[in-house]
């Protein structure tokens, strides 16, 4: 049996009948992602005002650590207090943390505020995925997933531009004030969009204190995130590689511990014979390979002689491709076509990365820079055409329907930790390259080309492993 167009909801239905719910689910992710990129643009002006340059890296490091730790608690929060209370608690902490950042008299206070923002933001971003299956009809899961994850692309454009504007006007504190205002407005919408009753995953009543917090999983993932983040701080390759290896080991231990304990982050179906583990692995490979974007602005300035603003918009080409790919792919109806698209997505990414590799050169003319932008668009499209369908497959491939929200919540954990690994790996590749900046740029793109191409093994398994799925 194949899916028909009538079984797939429309964008009009999602953004009219479920407008409030869509704003809440996508809004939490947008707040988290926009705040991340906005703060990076504000930091130079912030340091010029309150000092603390030695703590520069920790503003983003502890934000990431806090968000990864919080992401591991999403399903537990839903089961203990329900969807509405989880959102309101996350928004309250995020708003308070934004006020702390806005009023920070020193960098130490700002770092504390950013840590709180990361904790609240990680919860909000995870809730955006985890509640798709319980707040939207199944016919809208794909479009809901596309809308939620598209917020990363939107944030990549809006965050740096907004942060740069506030910084240029000397109003960096006001930027955090605006985040507080947006958080308050969203909090007002939550009771209306999510209803009066606290609802857990799948619509069940929260079970209160009977569901334990996954303490060991939380600690291991927090330690892994910290190791990855600190890996970016040393100026020596050996320390960086060692920290990345330690982080990989911690993630491996996390998987083993999560498999053996009752209070877990990953749904039990991950460890079964189904496709869920391959779905997560495909997403992980895509996120790691996407982190080639970390060095695009740098190489754009040094090899293409672009201005900082132009180089920033060049880097945003990947996000544009991601968003466009998601919107277009979410309209696909045939299960067979969707399976082929998802399976081929890593190869689409690899083709874009290969194009980027062969076009890197010094003193690049406009035509070559246009090819760089095209390569990034292709890379982003490779992610976008698969991501919403991978999200739906994750929710739909669990052995027990009650695991569906846990499967969706784990997507955010996979996304955050994989992105951090990708950024760290990109740094190792660039810093070990011999032969100057052109060789470093080519080496980065080539290394990630190989990684993305290898991802086709996981994507094929993700779409063909479970023969029960319609063809």
Swiss-Prot record:
Gene3D superfamilies: MFS general substrate transporter like domains. GO terms for molecular function: efflux transmembrane transporter activity; transmembrane transporter activity. The chain crosses the membrane at residues 23-43, 55-75, 91-111, 116-136, 146-166, 174-194, 213-233, 237-257, 279-299, 308-328, 337-357, 366-386, 410-430, 438-458. It holds the Pfam family MFS_1. It comes from the Bacteria. One of its GO terms (biological process) is xenobiotic detoxification by transmembrane export across the plasma membrane. Keywords: Antibiotic resistance, Cell membrane, Membrane, Transmembrane, Transmembrane helix, Transport. It is found in: Cell membrane. GO terms for cellular component: plasma membrane. Its main location: membrane. Could be involved in fluoroquinolones efflux. Belongs to the major facilitator superfamily. This is Probable multidrug-efflux transporter Rv1634. It comes from Mycobacterium tuberculosis (strain ATCC 25618 / H37Rv).
């Amino acid at each position: 049996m194949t899916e028909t167009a009538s079984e797939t909801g429309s964008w009009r239905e999602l953004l009219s009948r479920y407008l409030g719910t869509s704003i809440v689910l996508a809004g939490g992710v947008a707040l988290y992602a926009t705040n991340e990129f906005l703060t990076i643009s504000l930091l130079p002006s912030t340091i010029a005002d309150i000092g603390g340059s030695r703590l520069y890296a920790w503003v983003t490091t502890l934000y990431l650590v806090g968000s990864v730790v919080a992401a591991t608690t999403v399903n537990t929060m839903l089961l203990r207090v329900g969807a509405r209370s989880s959102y309101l608690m996350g928004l309250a902490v995020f708003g308070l943390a934004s006020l702390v950042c806005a009023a920070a008299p020193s960098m130490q206070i700002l770092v504390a505020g950013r840590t709180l923002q990361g904790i609240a933001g990680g919860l909000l971003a995870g809730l955006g995925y985890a509640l798709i299956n319980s707040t939207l009809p199944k016919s809208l899961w794909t479009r809901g997933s596309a809308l939620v994850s598209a917020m990363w692309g939107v944030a990549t454009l809006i965050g740096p531009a907004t942060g740069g504007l506030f910084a240029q006007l000397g109003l960096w504190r006001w930027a955090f004030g605006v985040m507080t205002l947006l958080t308050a407005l969203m909090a007002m919408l939550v009771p209306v969009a999510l209803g009066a009753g606290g609802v857990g995953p799948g619509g069940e009543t929260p079970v209160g204190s009977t569901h334990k917090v996954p303490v060991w999983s939380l600690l291991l993932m927090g330690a892994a995130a910290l190791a990855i983040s600190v890996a970016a701080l040393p100026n020596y390759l050996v320390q960086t590689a060692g920290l990345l290896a330690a982080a990989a080991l911690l993630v491996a231990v996390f998987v083993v511990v999560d498999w053996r304990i009752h209070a877990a982050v990953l749904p039990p179906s991950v460890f079964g014979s189904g496709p869920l583990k391959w779905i997560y692995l495909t997403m992980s490979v895509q996120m790691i390979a996407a982190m080639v974007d970390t060095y695009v602005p740098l190489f754009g300035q040094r090899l293409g002689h672009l201005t900082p603003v132009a180089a920033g918009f060049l880097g945003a080409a990947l996000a544009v491709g991601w968003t466009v790919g998601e919107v277009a792919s979410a309209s696909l109806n045939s299960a067979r076509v969707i399976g082929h698209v998802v399976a081929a997505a890593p190869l689409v990414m690899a083709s874009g990365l290969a194009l980027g590799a062969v076009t890197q050169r010094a003193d690049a003319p406009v035509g070559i820079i246009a090819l760089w932008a095209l390569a990034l668009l292709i890379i982003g499209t490779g992610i976008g055409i698969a991501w919403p369908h991978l999200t739906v497959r994750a929710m739909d491939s669990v052995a027990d329907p009650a695991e569906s929200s846990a499967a969706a919540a784990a997507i955010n954990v996979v996304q955050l930790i994989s992105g951090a690994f990708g950024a760290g790996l990109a740094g190792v590749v660039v810093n070990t390259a011999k032969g100057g900046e052109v060789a470093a740029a080519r080496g980065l793109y080539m290394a990630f080309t190989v990684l993305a191409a290898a991802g086709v093994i996981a994507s094929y398994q993700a779409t063909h492993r479970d023969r029960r799925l319609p063809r």
